[in-house]
Amino acid sequence: MKIDEIKLLYGYNDWADARILAACARVSPEQYAAPDSYGRGGLRATMIHILDNLWQQRITLQGYYQEPLADEAAYDATELHEDAIPTFAGLRERWMTEQREMRAYIDALTDETLNGTIRYVIPGLVREHVVWHILLDVIIHATQHRSEAAALLTAYGQSPGDFELTMFMNERASGKS
């Protein structure tokens, strides 16, 4: 993988995130917070899950989990939860921060570090992965859960539209994104 390729994919991911966030902004606070059996348990829960994965993978890549944390509770304490981000405004603010932080991380990579490995520890396991594999997994994970959020939003009459890479590329080529 090359830096320009991962930057293109993160450009797409940010574009798709903007579409889903714009649709979330159009639902009522009650719809946003409503529990549901679909996705991760509702729109807010699903969106926080996407954000948590972006956050967790970024801090993993930056070395936060190089050594084991004290216990399972210490790992749980690093996760983002609905009670900490109860409103859509809070989610959007944190999302923008995480996108900036991830972009800064990616901008500091070289082709060599992108293709290098990272070792990290999660409860009871030591893992090692290629950096770009983790970065790509963030995008794939977000794609899955954005589609779940999109289904919920569509049920509320607020479809975010399509998330196709070719749409992003066409908009980018025309200067719209």
Listing of model-derived features with the role each one plays in the protein:
Residues M1:
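An N-terminal RHG(E/S)-centered segment typical of histidine phosphatases
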Residues K7-A22, R26-T78, V121-S177:
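Short, contiguous alpha-helical
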Residues E79-Y120, E128-L152:
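Acidic/histidine-rich alpha-helical segments that form the ligand environment
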